[in-house]
Amino acid sequence: MSDATPFRPPSEAEEALIKETRLPLTGWQQEVDQGLTYGLEAAASIKDRSIPTFSRGELPHYAGINTFMKAPYLEDVREVGKYDVAIVGVPHDSGTTYRPGTRFGPQGIRRISALYTPYNFEMGVDLREQISLCDVGDIFTIPANNEKSFDQISKGIAHIFSSGAFPIILGGDHSIGFPTVRGICRHLGDKKVGIIHFDRHVDTQETDLDERMHTCPWFHATNMANAPAKNLVQLGIGGWQVPRQGVKVCRERATNILTVTDITEMSLDAAADFAIARATDGTDCVWISFDIDCIDAGFVPGTGWPEPGGLLPREALYLLKRIIRETNVCGMEVVEVSPPYDISDMTSLMATRVICDTMAHLVVSGQLPRTEKPAYIHAEANMAVDEPWQ
């Protein structure tokens, strides 16, 4: 046995062990110190003196207030520009056409996000040490009134975006895709945004059930000059839930669609290259709209329109990695998480993974933390970026 070649872990694991040594512990120590100050020192019988009497901070994972990853709750949203990333919930499911429950998506995602630490092993990223993150709570949506809710959503997202904080939206059904992009476009001036849309459904109908529902966001978003249809990339489309009315719009507007078969046959890297090239052609930034049902239904049962045959989690996460690291990302939303239909929080956990990976890739690619507002953010709001809706 002494002559045997010593075991060496694969290169990624070996690199991960080294990366961890380069990370500071400043944020962790600040959290401990604050916890002991605000939460009182522990009882005398507790040997680990970093533990307070009242839970403050990451540990224990089953306790505490459910903000996203236990990030600070920002009561005064006027101060959001002081943070690198702002998490905002949009508890709206009045746009659903089948199974409701996505109004509870933000709660479900926040609750299971407590399971995560801020550190990712493979990437060697510690979000607590490398960015400032806050949770601004939820936008006040209006039940049973999509248009009033859309107005609220656009105003809220425009506020966060214009502040310079990176907005991450917890949906909510996919009808919110239109007002979130509208909020972004209000502060783009003459700049343009490409949209990369992960989904099993095209979501390009003009109306559904006589309203702008979760099947309709991209028809209306791509009506705006700041969000051209030629820069809309749709990844994972397919199956038995793609209305022909929406297909007609995709054909007429020449959106860029890849099915799951396209992606697997051309390779993940080729699919990522395609998405990046089309979304960035003549645009200044990229918006990512991640519908959780793009993942195969066996992995994400807690959604409004589950469809078998979707992407595997590792496939979607790899595409996300390539796209975020190689484009100028201005924000993202994760939609269609419906906790009432979930099993063991697995859908909410998948959404959490998408969000945490996104933040880590932004750090690795140098997009976060920000030292100044991106040049594509225009200070003055253009409230007329979209056509009036009657």
Swiss-Prot record:
Annotated thermal dependence: Optimum temperature is 55-65 degrees Celsius. Is highly resistant to thermal inactivation.
The EC number(s) this enzyme carries: 3.5.3.-
Note describing how the cofactor binds: Binds 2 nickel ions per subunit.
Catalytic activity annotation: guanidine + H2O = urea + NH4(+)
Record-level GO cellular component terms: cytoplasm
Enzyme kind, highest EC tier: hydrolase
Domain of life the protein comes from: Bacteria
Keyword Cytoplasm in record: yes
Entry keyword Hydrolase: yes
Summary of pH dependence: Optimum pH is 9.5-10.
Gene Ontology molecular function: agmatinase activity; metal ion binding
Binding annotation for Ni(2+) 1: H174, D199, D203, D291
One BP term from GO: putrescine biosynthetic process from arginine, via agmatine
Documented activity regulation: Activation of GdmH depends on the presence of the accessory proteins GhaA (Sll1078) and GhaB (Sll1079), which load nickel into the active site. Hydrolase activity is slightly activated in the presence of GTP. It does not require ATP or NAD(P)H. Addition of Ca(2+), Mn(2+), Fe(2+) or Fe(3+) has no consistent effects, whereas addition of Co(2+), Cu(2+) or Zn(2+) inhibits the activity.
Listed InterPro entries: Agmatinase-rel, Ureohydrolase, Ureohydrolase_dom_sf, Ureohydrolase_Mn_BS
Effects seen without this gene: Knockout of the gene does not have any apparent physiological effects on the cells under normal growth conditions or under nitrate-deprived conditions. Nevertheless, under nitrate-deprived guanidine-supplemented culture conditions, the cell growth of the mutant is severely inhibited compared to the wild-type strain. The guanidine-degradation capability is abolished. Mutant exhibits arginase activity, as determined in cell extracts, identical to that found in the wild-type strain. The mutant shows about 69% of the agmatinase activity found in the wild type.
Residues binding Ni(2+) 2: D199, H201, D291, D293
Subunit structure: Homohexamer.
Function (record text): Catalyzes the hydrolysis of guanidine into urea and ammonium. Is highly specific for free guanidine. At pH 8, also catalyzes the release of urea from methylguanidine but with significantly reduced specific activity compared with that for guanidine. Cannot hydrolyze guanidinoacetate, guanidinopropionate, guanidinobutyrate, agmatine, arginine or creatine. Required to use guanidine as the sole nitrogen source for growth. Overexpression of the gene accelerates guanidine degradation and promotes biomass growth.
Annotated NCBIfam families: agmatinase
Name of this chain's protein: Guanidine hydrolase
Organism: Synechocystis sp. (strain ATCC 27184 / PCC 6803 / Kazusa)
Annotated gene: gdmH
